Amino acid sequence: MKQWIILVIVIILGTGVFYTVTRTEPPITLKELATQPQQWQIKVPDTTASIHLTSIKQLQQHPYLMGEYQTPDGADNTTIYLDINQAVQQGKYIATSFVTTNSGSGTFYYLSVFEQHNKKLENLTNVFIGDRINIEKIAIVNNNPLMIKIDYKTHGENTPYALPADVAKSQIYQLKNNQLVLQQ
């Protein structure tokens, strides 16, 4: 009987230790995530759909995580390029940008926030930043509440889109109710 009690106690303690260890695993690092496009699920702008990224593509000497979405009627195909080079991580949050291209001439840039849960990434929200801009830096400036600063260049009033973006801008967004809200 004494051996049975000891065995039951060992099983209970072992289960508790296992449960505690699995609950407190550290988030996956950006270095690991940069090589695992399938971990990234992204909400496709202007739709209710989301896609998993599927491959890594070299653009302008840097790796981008890539995925494609086709509308149900097959009329439009959107390609998403997630910029892992500018991704920043603070605890369970990751902020980065991605670019969408489709059959039109625009190249649309979004700021995106992900949250890690048990080594899975959830795309909390995306916000449109601009068309054919140049994102220079993304930084998490506060963790509670989450605040993200984005520095980029956009086109001036008289600058054609065929020329490089030339007007510097900075914006700070706060995550409120899983939405990015512009602060300044």
Feature names for model-found ranges:
Residues 101-106, 130-132:
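His-enriched metal-coordination microenvironments in redox/metal-binding proteins
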Residues 56-59, 104-108, 161-168:
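Short, solvent-exposed loop/turn segments at conserved positions within beta-propeller repeat blades
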Residues 100-104, 155-158:
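Short glycine/acidic-enriched loop and turn motifs that connect beta-strands
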Residues 109-117:
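Short, surface-exposed beta-strand/strand-loop-strand elements in extracellular ectodomains
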Residues 120-175, 181-184:
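Short aromatic loop motif centered on NTY/YTY
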Residues 88-99, 145-151:
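Acidic/hydrophobic-patterned starts of short beta strands in beta-sheet-rich repeat architectures
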Residues 2-87, 177, 183-184:
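Terminal domain-start segments
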Residues 77-89, 137-146:
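Beta-propeller blade termini
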